Every structure is written in C-alpha cells, then in structure tokens.
Design a protein with these regions (language model features):
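Active-site and donor-binding regions of nucleotide-sugar-utilizing enzymes
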Residues: 5-156
Length: 156
C-alpha cells in the first residue's frame, strides 16, 4: 500500500458516513489513485473505503450499552490502530464519534501519522476539558459551525 496515496478514515455512525462519503468522493475526484481503509458505512464503502469492521458495531447510545460493549469497542479500536500503524497512511481522518476517535487519533499522532478530525466535539457547550485531549490528538480540526473555529483559535 503506497503511504502517499492511502488515507485512514473512521466514521462511527450514519451521519458521519454521509459526511465521509462526500469527502471520499471529492478526494477520489482529485486523486483517482487514492485508497481508503478504516471503518464506515454504505456511503463510504461506495466511494472506495475498505471497511475493517461493521460500522454499526460502533453505534452505541446511553450509559449501559457502551459499558456492556466496552470490551468489543476497545478491541475494534485496537484493531484499527494496529492496521493504521502497519499501513502508515498519509493521514487519518476521524469523523465525529469523538469518544472513539480522539483516543485513536492521539495514538496515531504520537506515531507520526497526521490526524484530521471532521465535526468538532461541542467543547464550547459541555466538557470543555476535552480541548486538552484534542490538542494532543488532532493536527487539524475541521469545524462545521463558523463560531467553532473562533473557539479553537481562542483556546490555542
């Protein structure tokens, strides 16, 4: 796998898959020989993603379900991390799902894989302490809401 033409991508839910599908489509249009691996749904797979796990396995809600499924979720994250370390993508794009992606992104970044995160966690509304983790995990944050960019600029 040619590192300069490979991008790791992970979306954990349908809305992320829709956004990711649009991103992958545009990247393919600009660089026809780019390849993608990670986790995604129908849209991302349609646009060329090799999905390592079923995205639906990451879609957990509430307090009890994530706790029940914690061993499986940790195993999936470890598996994706090992895949990325082995294949050394040019960059890794985490789409939303911050509770899953930020830890993975931090590990990858510590191992010199560039990380991009699409859809900012709402640190401006709740859990502002996550800004420290984001700084450690993410090389570039792509925000959907205009004021989010200002928030990140104010907080370094």
């Amino acid at each position: 796998m040619d590192r300069s033409q490979h991008i790791g991508v992970l979306a954990g839910e349908k809305s992320g898959d829709i956004l990711g599908g649009a991103v992958l489509r545009e990247l393919k249009r600009r660089r026809s020989n780019v390849s993608f691996s990670g986790i995604g749904g129908e849209q991302m797979i349609f646009h060329g993603l090799t999905s390592l796990h079923d995205m639906e396995r990451l879609s957990v809600f509430g307090l009890v379900e994530p706790l029940k499924r914690l061993p499986e979720l940790l195993s999936i994250r470890r598996s994706v991390g090992q895949h990325m370390m082995k294949h050394q993508p040019q960059l890794f794009l985490g789409i939303d799902s911050p509770d899953f992606n930020l830890t993975l992104e931090q590990t990858l970044r510590q191992n010199r894989i560039k990380t991009v995160h699409l859809v900012s966690p709402s640190v401006w509304a709740w859990r502002p302490g996550r800004i420290r983790k984001i700084k450690k995990a993410v090389d570039l944050m792509l925000c959907l809401l205009p004021f989010e960019r200002d928030f990140y600029e104010q907080h370094g």
